[in-house]
């Protein structure tokens, strides 16, 4: 199939709709200048995300006591650092959700966004599937209208498992009422989005 022959495009966010490398570089400069006290928390938070993914891939279930993997990641970080989870959440939301917005818009993948708009204009169905909260970032990109469905960790309709588990993409297809075989997953990580797509019996396009 060519891209236009799919009924739905299911799209990753971070590193896919914008160039993550440049956003991270800009945020690293901001952290050094204005947020040194947050660096330890953010480093541990990112470590816990990859640790959770590795545990999940090894067949160990993520803790079911949390509302979402995102909530579990916050709790694990707080436990490791010996601080209240509310402190961790405040730092994470400020430095990973809110402040990057101004840079995300500048480094948007404009060609891909134009393709998405064209696909939707032709009647295609679209979903955003993310391992992190997405609402603020899609507003920064100005692309909310592009997506029929948003499936984001830590938000309503969010998955209970992280990629490469296919749950998020399968849930998006279900909400769109499109069969998995008619879906194209678009993402920047073959080891996460690609593996999830293959497990869901969907096609995959690496950006």
Question: What positions do the PLM features span?
Answer:
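Short glycine/proline-centered loop/turn elements that form peptide/ligand docking sites
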Residues: 17, 86, 113-114, 169, ...
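A generic "structured core" feature
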Residues: 14, 22-24, 105-109, 147, ...
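A metal-dependent, Asp-based hydrolase signature
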Residues: 48-97
């Amino acid at each position: 199939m060519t891209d236009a022959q799919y009924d739905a495009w299911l799209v990753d966010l971070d590193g896919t709709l914008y160039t993550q490398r440049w956003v991270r570089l800009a945020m690293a400069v901001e952290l050094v200048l204005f947020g040194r006290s947050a660096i330890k928390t953010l480093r541990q938070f990112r470590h816990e995300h990859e640790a959770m993914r590795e545990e999940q891939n090894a067949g160990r279930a993520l803790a079911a006591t949390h509302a979402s993997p995102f909530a579990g990641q916050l709790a694990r970080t707080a436990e490791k650092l010996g601080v209240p989870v509310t402190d961790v959440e405040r730092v994470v939301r400020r430095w990973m959700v809110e402040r990057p917005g101004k840079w995300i818009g500048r480094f948007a993948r404009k060609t891909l966004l134009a393709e998405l708009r064209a696909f939707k204009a032709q009647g295609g169905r679209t979903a955003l599937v993310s391992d992190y909260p997405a609402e603020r970032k899609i507003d920064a990109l100005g692309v909310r209208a592009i997506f029929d469905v948003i499936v984001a960790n830590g938000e309503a309709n969010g998955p209970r498992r992280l990629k490469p588990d296919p749950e998020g993409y399968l849930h998006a297809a279900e909400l769109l009422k499109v069969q998995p075989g008619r879906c194209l997953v678009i993402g920047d990580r073959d080891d996460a989005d690609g593996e999830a797509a293959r497990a869901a019996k969907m096609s995959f396009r690496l950006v």
